[in-house]
Each structure stands twice: as structure tokens, then as C-alpha cells.
Swiss-Prot record:
Pfam families: Zn_clus (PF00172). PROSITE patterns: ZN2_CY6_FUNGAL_1, ZN2_CY6_FUNGAL_2. Residues 21-64, 124-164, 730-740 have a biased composition (Low complexity). This is Glucose transport transcription regulator RGT1. Glucose-responsive transcription factor that regulates expression of several glucose transporter (HXT) genes in response to glucose. In the absence of glucose, it functions as a transcriptional repressor, whereas high concentrations of glucose cause it to function as a transcriptional activator. In cells growing on low levels of glucose, has a neutral role, neither repressing nor activating transcription. The keyword Cytoplasm applies. Residues 1-73, 113-165, 197-218, 291-322, 720-740, 884-908 are annotated as: Disordered. PANTHER family: GLUCOSE TRANSPORT TRANSCRIPTION REGULATOR RGT1-RELATED (PTHR31668:SF26), GLUCOSE TRANSPORT TRANSCRIPTION REGULATOR RGT1-RELATED-RELATED (PTHR31668). Residues 75-104 bind DNA. The gene is RGT1. Keywords: Activator, Cytoplasm, DNA-binding, Metal-binding, Nucleus, Repressor, Transcription, Transcription regulation, Zinc. The keyword Iron does not apply. InterPro entries: Carb_Metab_Trans_Reg, Zn2-C6_fun-type_DNA-bd_sf, Zn2Cys6_DnaBD. It comes from Vanderwaltozyma polyspora (strain ATCC 22028 / DSM 70294 / BCRC 21397 / CBS 2163 / NBRC 10782 / NRRL Y-8283 / UCD 57-17).
Amino acid sequence: MTDIAESTAHPRDGVPPSQQTTASVASAALATATASASPTTGSATSTAAPGKRSRSSSTGSAKGSIGGKKATRACDQCRKRKIKCDYDNDKNVCSSCNRNGDRCQFNRVQLKRGPSKGFNRNNSTSSAAGASTTSSTHQTFNANASGNTNSSNNNNHNNNNNNSVLLPPITQYFQGNEQNHDQQFWKVPVDLAGHLSPHHSQSHLHRDSVDSATSNNSNLNINGINIVDNSTTNSQSGGYFPVSACRSRASSVPSFPRKPPMQIQPPMTSMYASSLGGGTPATGAIGASNTAVSGATVPGTSSKRRKSVVSSNESPRTSRASLLPRPDFAVVNLVPVPQNVVTPASSLPAVPSGPLPSTGVGVGGSTGQVRLTDLDLINTYYEFVHLNFPVIPINKKALTSDILVINTSIEELNDLVIVWFRNSLELLVTVSLEQPQTQSTHAYTESLNSCFQNVVNLYPRLKQNNGIDPKVKIVYLCTFLILIYVLFFLGQHNSFIISVSVTIFNNFGLYGKLLSLNTSSPDSSSPYDIIFVRLYLLLVTFDSSYSMALGTPKLLNLEINGLVDKFFNLKSQNEHLFIDENLIKVNCILKNLELGEYICNASHMKDSSDAMKVIKSTYMSKKHQSKKADHSSSVSPMFISEWFQKFLVDKKNLISLLLDYQLRINDITPLQLSKLYVDLTNSLCALITVILEILKLMMKLNPTNSIDYNYRPLQHFDIDKPPSGGGGSSSTNTSSNPYSNPNSNEFYQKLLGLSSDRNTNLADMTRGCITPFAIITINELFNVTELIKNIPSSLISVVMESTKEEKENTINPQDLVLKLSNSMNEIVQITSLLTMVKPYKGIDSSYPRWQKFSKRSGPIPSMAPSNTATSTIQDFSEYNMTRSPSLGSSAYSNNPHSQHSDHNFNETNDYNDNISIFKKIYYENNNIQNNTTPQNEVLQSYIDTAWRLLDDSELGWL
């Protein structure tokens, strides 16, 4: 009787009590009568505890309450609403379902959770007794139990010694019969929990809900794009899937996980908390997607990784709520583009039109902003960054469908590489967004240093794994280049980042790949090797630019003549090797990279400690003219990079022109002097014109060097019509996209003629794009302008006097005076533009030294009477460049009493006289007395300007 009553205590799964068979009801009634006769036995056997049930061998056995009693479990509708259920057999419906017009159903299959009641691991007797009374699917084994020698217990004993639970692949539950369609859940034996550690027991048995075999929560659809989790099993973390099963479920699409484990968190990560305040949860669309992902239990991921407390400081704008999920990155399905087909930029996936909110938690702790998704970060990079300097030297399709598809056996390490790649890219986008300068650059510097430290910490683990996927190495090395880009973008002086990056690049053997591929055809080489060579060439460009900007020796003293065109402009049929899918953009990228190639070649003398060798071989020899310089001077520039390259060439020619007369200044003839002044006028006017063109383009395209979603690059180009004018413009009308930069001043736009031209120029492709060389460019333009701005007014009187004394006057002095007058007008415009072009970030940025130069701007010597020549030269000698010792070059100043509050230490005078460093070295080697008065003092003053320009070129621009 007891067994019968116990078997009928609960309703059958999926069958309401009203549908029980007559025989079952009769048996239940008999059990009730027996219970009434024997209250002690009946009360212990016939009443089932709420929420518990006994499994019956018969599928048709009835479970539930009888005799008008309430059911012992809530119906599915009430359980879903989480309300109390008062189901009654007489009505066959509860009050809640009756009000809502629903029908009570009991289809949900409930699993037991946790160990069995009263289970004691140390009690071998209880374990043995439990093993004899439990079904075969719930067998348990205790190593100390005796008398149990069957084969199944031996197998369980072996599994217990291995301290692991291996279940068959989940795919075996997908059979074609109807019975398996009703049973959609896979189960872990409850009694096996005693043989698992408490940590594993909680992670595998005490989950929020059971794992459905047919509903794979790792396959989500965010923003209409299919993304799949690429987790694999970590055998050391107690995963409950076999390794082979997890690998079969591995994804073929990339992901940007945001949750590295706790073991890779150096102390420097704590700097984010104080400087960036990333404790506010992200809101908006990404928050919704994170909520969807966070509900998924990814097989093969240990509970230790799921439960680890991840610091919110891993990214400068990553909140704790946004770090816990693992949002995936999707494949962007782009149509393959043949080499001879130009794909308009409008057909590429891009960020939706209109302004986008800034990313994450703002720098300094400002909240209320929406974090950019992974796809938005990629689109932002390729729209605003890639065109001026491809720090990720592949096109968007190759990045999203190949390089970021990473899933190897070292799954945890791969996740960390992707995490810091994403954080570095987000840092770049964060610091470049258009925003008010209310924060200190210290916050950005702390973020950069912390991110770089975490990336460097991954290097030993990557280096010791010889079989690591080349794609992981590419992503890892790209992360270094992105951080160096941020370093240049902020104008920071930190040679540690570049030096460590050079060391890691060399240890990965990239120099050997460059030597190997340079002697063979790149088309026949491995695509990954070509990408490695591109990364190395970009690092050489950064190193050379840093050397020129700070006046320090190069770390990679390589000549890369012709290598940019060889490795970045491949004629290969492999579309993944294209630097961009739009051929017009490819041309723009190559032009910008050629600037780095020229800077690399111009800084090749930084390996010499002999200053005289630098002076004589580089600036005092007319034979030393690079082919690149001759070529660039004959081609009309279009882009800022080409104009700046021409500026460097013209500056070098001006220095060489004047220094060539240093030795024979006392032996020069009047005819030679007249010719010198003509050449000086032409060279000086050309240099001033180039400076103005660069500043006008910077003002027109992106005066703040920031990303502004309201001021995007042009998306359509008409390449059928030939270019017109000196700027290579095409006649595509851009009335829908006028040159009305919201950040610029309308008055100066009209004054400079920037608002009247409505025709598209090829240089306007880079409108709104950022560049890493904006700060060093504006500083160099400022330095040269301050040194030469007074020379045109002085040359006017000099030219007039020299042409009068010449008997055979073949030069019209009015033409020279007109040129010099126009240059004086251009100097005024340059001075105005230098105050408006502000690529600096942060309120404490190192702006050009306006006051330092203005205090030393003395009059240029002119054709003055002999009694005033000495005083004039003295005034002009005070016009000297002041250099900051924090920039890696020797500090020297003309005013020993000057105090500079923008540095942490005082500047000192290396020399007592008011001459340049290179001039002093030259005078000492040639036994020339500095206090000797030259016969032509005016010419000597111009040569002194050339010496100071030489100091600027060789000792740093910043």
C-alpha cells in the first residue's frame, strides 16, 4: 500500500490531475483509505513534499493531488509569472489561468539540484547503500567502500581518481525519434556531485537554469549579424565537455572578448580607477546586447573564468557591466572586389549616418555616454584612421573574415590578445574623438602606459608557444603599432614604448622576413609574411619619425627605398593583400606612406656621432641630393603628406644654399652675392608658400585632428574625369557636403578662400581623417616660421642695393620685391593659422612655444650704416631657437634668466655664446674665431639662420 500511495503522490509530467486514468484514481483512493486506517504509516508515505517527486517506471502513471486537493506543484503559466498557483482538480484550472483565459499545463520537466539529502562523503556505508538503491543513471561510488567489485564501479573509481566528469557529446541526444524531441534537456547525475569539488559542484549543478541542447545561447543575433562564441575547453579549469566536443563547436568568426582572467593583471591597471573612473555601467544599445549575451552559459568555459571579478580598469572606458559578457565580432560579408574594379566607399559597411555618441564612460569619470560596439570601432578606424596611416595594414574584409578568426588550442591566450587589441583600438578612438579640452593629458598617458604594460606581459607566453597561429601574432603586433599611434597622436615623449616594441618585433624575426621577401617576388610569398613585413615597415616609419621629431638616434637604421610600393601596392590576385578595396584610397594611402619613407631616408645620418660628417656630407655638398627629393619637387603635391615632404626638401635646400657660402664668405664676389640673393629669394618664398598650403589644408580638412561623426570623409569620387589644377581636383560637385567645418571660423574660411571652392579635390578624401603626425608637423612649421619670418622684409632692401651696384643687371629687382612682398603677406596668414590649427589633446598639452619665440624675435639686419651694424647683428644674434631638454636633445637658451613653467626642471645654457650647437662645432673644427666680424655681416646673419635651421632638423622638431 505504501508503494502504491507513494507512486501516485505527484501528477504525471505534462498531464493535469483531471486526466488521470480510472485505475490510477482507484488505486489512489485505496491508498487514502489505508492511510486513514494507519495514520503513522500513511502520513509518512502518502504525503509528498512540495517541489519533490518520485519517478515512476510507467510513463502513464498519474501524479498529482486527488480528492479535490490542490496540486503539489504550480502550473507552467504560474511558474512563468512567478505567482502562487491554486490549481484545483474539480475546476481543472487555477484562478490565474482562469482570469487570463489560459489552460493549466504541466509540461516543464524539473531536475533535481544539489546533492542528495543527507549525503555524507565520508560515510562509506551511506554511499554503498545509496548505490544499491539508486538507478543506474544515478550511481555513485566511494573509494573506501568494500564489497563492491563490479565493472561499472571500477570505471567510476577510475573517473574519480582523475577528478573529472566526462559526458558523451551533446549531439547524441539529437535523434530522429519523437521521444527525444520531447526530452530536450541533458542532465548531470545528481549523486555525482559528491565526487566533485565544491567549486565544480556549484558551477555545473547549481546554475541559473538547465542547459538546453537545442537552444544554443552562444549563437546570438546582435544588430542583425550572426555571431558565434569561439570558446574552447580549458581542461585545467574543470570543463564538463570533452576537448574534442568543444573544438567541434568552435566558431569560425572573430570575437572581441572583454574579460581576461585575473592572473594577467599587473599593478599598473589600478591607474585606470583614479584617472578614468570606469565604474558606471554602460547604457544604450550595447547594454542590451550585453544583457542577452550574459544569460548564455558557454560550454567549455570554466566557472573560475565566469566567476572571476574583472577589474573595470582594463580599458579606459570599459565598465564592469560591459566586461562580464563576451560580445562577439561578426563577419562583414563584403563582395570580393577584383583589382581593376573600384568599389565606392558607400557600398562598404559603415557606421550609420549622422552623429554617433562617444564611447563608454568618458575620460575623467564622465557618464551618460554610450559605448561603441566592436563593429563601430572597426568602421570608425577604416573611415577616419586607415586612410592617412594604415596602422592595421590590411583591408576591412581581410581583418574581419580572416585575421580576427582566431581559435586555436591556446584559447585563453588568444582571448587576451583580442581583448587588448580591442582596448588599444578603443583607446585610439577615445582620445581622438571631438570633445572639449577639459581633461588633462595625464589621464590619457596613464591609460596608454597601463594598456602597453598589459600587452607586454603577454609576450613571454606568446614567445614560448612555437605553434601559435600567425594571425595571433599579427593581431598582437598590430596592438603595439596602435599604441605607438596613440603616443604620436598625443605628442608624448616616451621612447620606452617604441624601444620595447622594436625589441619584440625583432624577437619575432620580422627583420629576417623582410630580407627574405625583399630578394624574391612578394606575390609568391605567404600572405601572412607580407603582412609581417608591412608591420615592420610601419614600425621603421614610426621610429624614423620619432628620431626626427626628438632628435634622437634611430633604433632601426634601415633604408626602405621603394619598399612601400613593393609591399603595399601588390599586383596579387589575393584580395586579402590589398591595403584597401578602393583603388583611389590605395593611392592616397601610398602617398601618405611615402612621407614616412622619405623621413626614414632623411634620418639615416642619425647613426653618426661625427657632427662634421653630418654637416659636410648632408648640407654642405651640392652633390648630395636624393632622387626622392628631385622627384617630389617636380610633382605637384596634393595631400598634406606630399606638401610636408616638399617642405622638408625646400628647407634642406635653403640650409644647403646658405651653408655653402660659410667658408668663402669673405671671398665672395659681388656677382656671386647678387646671384645668391636671387636664389635665396626664390628658395625662401617657395618655403613660405609651402608652409601656408600645409596650414590651409589642415584648416580645411581637420583643424583639431579629431574624429567628428558630423564631419566625415568623402564617400564618392569621380575618377573618370581628369584632375584639374595643381591639386589634382575633379569636378565632382559636393553641394551636399560643403566644406563647412563646424569647428572652424567662418570669417577665416572666407578670408582664406576655403568656402568658395565647391569642387572636390583628391586631397579632400582625407577630410575628417586623423593623422599621427599632426603635432610634430605643426611644431616644425612653427619653428621654421619663427626663424624665417623676418627675412623677407630684410631681403627687400638687400636686393635693391645689390642690383644697383651690379653693372650687368639681368635681373629685374621689381620681380624679386613682388615675391618678397607676397611672402610677407603669407607670413601674416601663417601666423593667424598657427593660432587656429590645434591638434593638441588635453588642457595641459605642450603647445608651440609662442612666448619663448616672441621674446627673442629681434630685427633682421638690413643695409644699415656701418656705425649701427654691430648693434643690429647683436639684436639678430638674440634671435635664437630655444629647445626643451625634455625632448631628448641638448638644452640651450639665450636667456639665462628665463623660466619655463611647462617643464618639471629648469633649462640651462650649454654654451655662453649665442650661436647654434652645430655652428660652434664647425667653428672649433675649422679654427674660426666666433668673435671675428665678417666683411658681409648681413650675409652672415642669414647663414646664422641656416645654422639654427640645421639645429632644428638634426636635434628635433619638438
